[in-house]
C-alpha cells in the first residue's frame, strides 16, 4: 500500500509498504477513504532534524472496516467509521470519567500515527471506533468533510470549551484561527456563549469564524491585543480557549481573562514546562489536554453533524489526492489552505 513519510525537512513523499495486520484481538484494519493534514503535523514537517523515511504523524481518518480481531463485536467488515485520533479503551478510570483522550491503558499518548495512507490498524477498536450510518456514497462531499473533522479537530475544539466550562452567557476568547480554533468557535456557540472573540490576523479565517458564530475578531497581539479584547468585552473574558500550542498563545490567553476566569488549552505544547505561579493572583483555573474524541462523537457531535446543526467540514478549504500529499503539506505550511483534505479512492 501507499504510505506518506518524511523525505527531509519541508518535504514528504509516498513509499510502498506492507498492509497492516491484526496484532491484537480488539484491532481493526481500516481502508481509509479520507484523511488530512493537521496543523500539528507541521511541527514535524518543519523540523530540520527530521530523519528521511520517518513515519509521519497523520492521525485523522474516516474509512471502511476491512478486517476485525476476534474480540470485536461492535463493528463488522464493510462498516463506515470515524477513526478517532485517540484510542480509548472505554473501561479504565480515565475513559469512564470521560477523558478517553488520555486512556490509562496506554503508555505515553494513545494517538494514531501514520494514517496518511491507504490502510491503518486501529487499536481498542471495540469501544473507540465511531460507526457512521450507511456508506460514504450515501453522503455529499461536504458531509464527508464534516465526518472527517470528528476524528480530531471538532472534538478538540469542543474539548477546549468543555474543560474551560463554557456555559450559556459566557464571554469567550479563542486564540488560534486554524481548524481547531474555528471548531472552538463552533463549540463555544454550541455551549451558549454570548460573545465569542477570535484572535486572528488572517482575513479569510476571520470571515469563516464570524460565519461560525464569532461576534468579533481581534488582529492585534500582545498587550495591544489584550487591551482590544477587554474593550470589546467590557472587561476580561470568562473563558479563553488556547488552540495553538506556543508560550505566546498561552500568555495571550491568560492575559484576556478576568480574575477567576478559566483557561482551556488544547494546542499541543511546543514550549518548556510553564510555571503557573503567575495565575495565583488571578485565581485562574487551567485545564486541557488531548480531546475525548470517542466520547464527544458518540454523545452528541456525530448527531449534530447528521442533523445539520453544525458544519465543521468547511475548515477543509482544499482537497488533494494521496499522490499530491507533498503539495497539501506545502499549502498548509504556507497558509494557502486552512486544512487540507486527502481523498483516497
Q: What kind of region is each of these model predictions?
A:
Residues 262, 274-314:
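Rossmann-fold dehydrogenase core element
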Residues 89-175:
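NAD(P)H dinucleotide-binding glycine-rich loop of Rossmann-like/cofactor-binding domains
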Residues 164-168, 191, 203, 207-287, ...:
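Glycine-rich cofactor phosphate-binding loops and adjacent beta1-alpha1 units
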Residues 138-223, 227, 239:
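Mid-domain Rossmann-like dinucleotide-binding core that forms the NAD(H)/NADP(H) cofactor-binding site
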Residues 20-35, 48-96, 113, 133-140:
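Glycine-rich beta-strand-centered segment in the early N-terminal region that forms part
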Residues 84, 241-243, 344:
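Short, well-ordered coil/turn residues at beta-beta hairpins
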Residues 3, 235, 247, 251-255, ...:
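C-terminal hydrophobic helical "lid"/dimerization subdomain
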Amino acid at each position: 500500500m501507499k504510505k506518506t513519510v518524511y523525505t527531509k525537512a519541508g518535504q514528504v513523499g509516498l513509499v510502498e509498504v506492507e498492509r497492516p495486520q491484526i496484532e491484537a484481538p480488539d484491532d481493526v484494519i481500516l481502508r481509509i477513504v479520507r484523511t488530512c493534514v493537521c496543523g500539528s503535523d507541521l511541527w514535524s514537517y518543519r523540523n530540520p532534524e527530521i530523519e528521511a523515511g520517518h513515519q509521519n504523524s497523520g492521525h485523522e481518518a474516516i474509512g471502511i472496516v476491512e478486517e476485525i480481531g476476534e474480540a470485536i463485536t461492535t463493528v463488522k467488515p464493510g462498516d463506515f467509521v470515524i477513526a478517532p485520533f485517540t484510542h480509548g479503551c472505554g473501561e479504565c478510570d480515565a475513559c469512564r470519567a470521560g477523558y478517553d483522550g488520555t486512556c490509562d491503558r496506554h503508555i505515553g499518548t494513545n494517538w494514531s500515527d501514520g494514517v496518511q495512507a491507504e490502510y491503518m490498524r486501529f487499536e481498542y477498536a471495540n469501544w473507540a471506533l465511531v460507526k457512521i450510518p450507511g456508506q460514504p456514497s450515501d453522503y455529499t462531499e461536504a458531509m464527508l468533510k464534516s465526518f472527517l473533522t470528528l476524528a480530531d479537530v471538532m472534538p478538540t475544539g469542543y474539548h477546549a470549551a468543555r474543560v474551560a466550562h463554557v456555559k450559556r452567557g459566557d464571554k469567550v476568547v479563542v486564540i488560534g484561527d486554524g481548524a481547531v480554533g474555528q471548531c472552538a468557535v463552533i463549540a463555544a456557540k454550541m455551549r451558549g456563549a454570548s460573545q465569542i472573540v477570535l484572535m486572528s490576523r488572517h482575513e479569510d479565517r476571520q470571515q469563516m469564524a464570524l460565519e461560525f458564530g464569532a461576534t468579533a475578531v481581534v488582529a492585534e497581539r500582545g498587550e495591544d491585543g489584550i487591551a482590544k479584547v477587554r474593550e470589546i468585552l467590557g472587561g476580561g473574558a470568562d473563558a479563553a480557549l488556547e488552540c495553538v500550542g506556543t508560550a505566546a498563545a498561552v500568555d495571550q490567553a491568560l492575559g484576556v481573562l478576568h480574575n477567576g476566569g478559566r483557561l482551556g488549552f488544547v494546542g499541543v505544547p511546543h514550549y518548556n514546562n510553564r510555571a503557573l505561579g503567575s495565575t495565583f493572583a488571578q485565581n485562574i483555573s487551567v485545564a486541557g489536554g488531548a480531546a475525548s474524541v470517542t466520547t464527544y462523537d458518540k454523545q452528541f457531535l456525530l448527531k449534530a453533524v447528521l442533523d445539520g446543526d453544525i458544519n465543521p467540514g468547511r475548515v477543509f478549504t482544499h482537497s488533494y489526492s494521496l499522490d499530491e500529499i507533498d503539495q497539501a503539506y506545502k499549502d498548509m505550511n504556507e497558509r494557502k489552505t486552512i486544512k487540507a483534505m486527502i481523498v483516497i479512492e
